[in-house]
């Protein structure tokens, strides 16, 4: 009797887990389209507005979900939460700059290297073992990256690619910091990253003489991204990841990478270069191969910048 009632429940949990995680990837994949639709604001102004809405959204969410202040949870996690929060600020900044200065396809594919960077950092910092298959996948991914940046030997596009890799490194540090703090709870650290971003971007805007007032269109898009693109995506991922193994999470995360370039092609007519497509295919093969080769420890999600 017990097995008959448990099996459908487990199957339903898996089904909804797949649905929620895929939906999170769909929301995260809109980051490129959102930034492309912003007309005048620069990276620091976009990040400021997005961080304000994200922080307010997560504060309410954490209070409702846990019944306690996010600051209580941050104190519980300790210094790793600070490291995680600061690393996300770097990741967000690099991500927005990358999308503004290279193709969305190129940026999104390079963001996807974050799990490989996290594996290497985990090995160095936490002495976590790395499977042989992961090392092979990392080598293949490096080859794909080389192909992608081969036609960007100079100029703004190369800076965008470097910023995208820097963003991926920031997300990798975030992942390792949460493992260091022995917590799978990402929301308090993401909330803290929003507060850090507000302070840092406000100071930069003051220093550069940038206006704190954006056009209704730019401000609305940036704040909408904080709630819907980042915040709602986090909720769906948190709900779905509880019932899925790490290998499935890694495969479902590819939805974000694949759909991001699709949106800007459909709505804005933006295309990718041949090098980006070929190198991206190699990179995606490395990610998928690593996921299929065996289950890994379930990592916190790599959120869209």
Predicted regions and their residues:
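Helix-helix packing/entry segments at the starts of transmembrane helices
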Residues: 107-113, 178-198, 230-266
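Loop-to-transmembrane alpha-helix entry segments
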Residues: 75, 108-111, 124-147, 154-161, ...
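Hydrophobic transmembrane alpha-helices of multi-pass small-molecule transport proteins
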Residues: 58, 88, 130-150, 167-171, ...
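Hydrophobic alpha-helical transmembrane segments of multi-pass integral membrane proteins
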Residues: 15-23, 45-61, 79, 137-140, ...
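Specific alpha-helical transmembrane segments that line the substrate/conduction pathway
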Residues: 45-56, 88, 96-127, 167, ...
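Specific transmembrane alpha-helical segments of multi-pass solute transporters/efflux pumps
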Residues: 63-106, 111, 147, 226-244
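Glycine-/small-residue-enriched transmembrane alpha-helix faces in small-molecule transporters
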Residues: 2-48, 86, 94, 143, ...
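C-terminal-most transmembrane helix of multi-pass membrane proteins
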Residues: 2-4, 51, 150, 218, ...
């Amino acid at each position: 009797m017990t097995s008959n009632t448990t099996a459908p429940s487990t199957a339903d949990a898996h089904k909804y887990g797949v649905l929620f995680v895929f939906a999170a990837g769909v929301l995260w994949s809109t980051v490129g389209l959102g930034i492309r639709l912003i007309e005048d604001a620069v990276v620091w102004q976009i990040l400021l507005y997005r961080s304000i809405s994200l922080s307010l959204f997560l504060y309410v969410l954490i209070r409702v979900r846990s019944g306690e202040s996010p600051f209580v949870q941050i104190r519980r996690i300790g210094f790793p939460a600070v490291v995680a929060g600061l690393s996300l600020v770097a990741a967000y900044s690099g991500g927005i700059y990358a999308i503004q200065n290279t193709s969305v396809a190129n940026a999104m594919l390079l963001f996807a290297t974050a799990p490989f960077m996290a594996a290497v950092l985990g090995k160095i910092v936490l002495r976590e073992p790395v499977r042989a298959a992961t090392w092979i996948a990392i080598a293949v991914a490096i080859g794909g990256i080389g192909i992608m940046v081969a036609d960007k030997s100079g100029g703004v596009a190369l800076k965008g690619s470097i910023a995208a890799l820097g963003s991926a490194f920031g997300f990798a540090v975030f992942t390792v910091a949460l493992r260091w703090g022995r917590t799978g709870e990402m929301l308090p650290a993401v909330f803290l990253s929003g507060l850090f971003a507000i302070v840092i971007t406000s100071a930069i805007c003051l220093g550069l003489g940038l206006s704190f007032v954006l056009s209704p269109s730019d401000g609305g898009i940036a704040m909408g991204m904080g709630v819907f693109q980042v915040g709602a995506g986090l909720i769906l991922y948190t709900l779905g990841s509880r019932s899925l193994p790490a290998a499935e999470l890694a495969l479902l995360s590819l939805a974000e990478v694949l759909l991001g370039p699709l949106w800007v092609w459909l709505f804005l007519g933006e295309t990718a270069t041949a090098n980006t497509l070929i190198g991206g295919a190699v990179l995606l093969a490395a990610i998928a191969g690593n996921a299929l080769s065996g289950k890994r420890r379930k990592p916190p999600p790599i959120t869209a910048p």
